[in-house]
Amino acid sequence: MFDKTITRWGTHSAKWDLLAADLGQDALSLSVADMEFATCPAVSRAITRACEPGIFGYTEVFDDFREAVRGWQARRHGWSPAVGDVHFFPRIVQCVSALCAIVLPGQFGRAPRVVTLDPAYGPIIEVVERAGCELRRIPLDLSEGRVVIPERHFAEAMRDADLLLWCNPHNPTGRVWTSEELDMVSTLALTYGVTVLSDDIHADFQRPGRNGYRPLAIHSQQLWESGRLIQCSSPGKTFNSAGLEASAIVVRGVLGERLEEAKRLMGLHNPNFF
């Protein structure tokens, strides 16, 4: 599956056809948000089976989706969230939008103060800025050949913040954060009452022999039980299936209910048939 050349020109590809429209078909896309090899055969077979009846009506999320999320997390990462804590969003960036534009402004009566590491995923930054948030970007230290969080600046930014946009493994550097770094994040979040959204969409890409990924929810049970930690995952990167738009948002209690209300307000219901 990794040695077959697939041409994506003319398929309405955001990666290739948008580039061609701007720069011509000789341009080479260096984006890595999706890839040029096919998804695994099991995924293709499942989609083919879903197509066979020939009816593509409105669909709904049931507990089999939530059970699938819990099962994957348990098998791969040793974490078994409660089924009732699993919520569906098409894309993680839409969950960020719901938080920044609806949920947190409703809670505080103002635009939230948001902390993120820099560099960060561009569409998420755009959503935060368009929501009128105060964005605090903490540049990562790359001076010694590895990615390091400047702890003093990070702690200062967290002091009166409302939301931390965390990413593990980090996008775009690929850094998997250590136990000590996760300790720092959870301690600061608990100390200052900061909500944490952990975008773990790349969690299933791990290189053998490197620092292993661990969900923040496992690392800090106290932060998870506080109801201020949102764990986000998706098969989109792992299986090169971003166009199917399916993400799992796992969060405890009232915050999950508020995200569901915000999702309805955004007109997000009846997910993609696939």
How would you label these PLM feature ranges?
Residues 40, 44, 65-66, 182, ...:
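A general structural signal for well-ordered alpha-helical segments in protein cores
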Residues 168, 196-197:
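Residue-level marker for buried hydrophobic side chains located in beta-strands
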Residues 33-35, 168-172, 237:
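Short glycine-rich anion-binding loops that position phosphate/pyrophosphate groups of nucleotides
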Residues 56-187, 203-224, 230:
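Conserved core of the PLP fold type I
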Residues 162, 193-195:
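The start of beta-strands in P-loop NTPase/AAA+ ATPase cores
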Residues 200:
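Walker B catalytic acidic pair
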Residues 2-94:
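N-terminal small-domain helix-loop-helix segment of the aminotransferase-like
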Residues 61, 228-274:
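PLP-dependent aminotransferase class I/II
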